[in-house]
Swiss-Prot record:
A cellular-component GO term for this protein: cell envelope
Keywords: Acyltransferase, Cytoplasm, Nodulation, Plasmid, Transferase
Species of origin: Rhizobium etli (strain ATCC 51251 / DSM 11541 / JCM 21823 / NBRC 15573 / CFN 42)
Entry EC no(s): 2.3.1.-
Major place of residence: cytoplasm
Subcellular location: Cytoplasm; Cell envelope
Annotated GO MF terms: acyltransferase activity
Name of protein: Nodulation protein A
Entry keyword annotation includes Cytoplasm: yes
Classification of source organism: Bacteria, Pseudomonadati, Pseudomonadota, Alphaproteobacteria, Hyphomicrobiales
Gene3D superfamilies: 3.40.630.30
Family: Belongs to the NodA family.
Known function: N-acyltransferase required for nodulation. Acts in the production of a small, heat-stable compound (Nod) that stimulates mitosis in various plant protoplasts.
Amino acid sequence: MSPQVRWKVCWENELELSDHTELADFFRKTYGPTGAYNALPFEGARSWSGARPELRVIGYDAHGVAAHMGLLRRFVRVGEVDLLVCELGLWGVRPDLEGYGINSMRIVYPVLQQLGVRFAFGGVRQALRNLVLRLCRNGLATVLEGVRVRSTLADVYLNLPPTRCENVILVVFPIGCSMSDWPSGTLIERNGPEL
């Protein structure tokens, strides 16, 4: 039986310190099993990894945070085209709830329409390919492979270049337009840190 999840949409400025602390704990427990390094950004009460979200969609159940997705409007460059998008990041479902079909996209999609963007996108690691394909089977999104995303690092380090380029699986959600309106190009310039 699917657990009862209640969803909350909130702007970043609406979060209290206790919210950040609870979310940081959620991310450590959700991302930690995928590799200790993945949980490092969420030390203390830090509830973001790179860029901070503008909006958050948070699912709660009787045990606390059950699921999360962060949203951030930004301009990216796809090939030669500048495009206002909503980046989706900080996706997560608490490990004990995986496989129950908890999906925030039915909550996120109307929010994306209100934000006035034509596309939402998120980049995920190759290891999550099957999960993303399941997420997109309802036809709301298209999976693009062979796309590189160049981002700035969240912090500047003397021993590292200021940008990195990653081969990711890109999930693109057309919002009130057609997927054919997505510009062609195999490089996306994020011009900022990933969400």
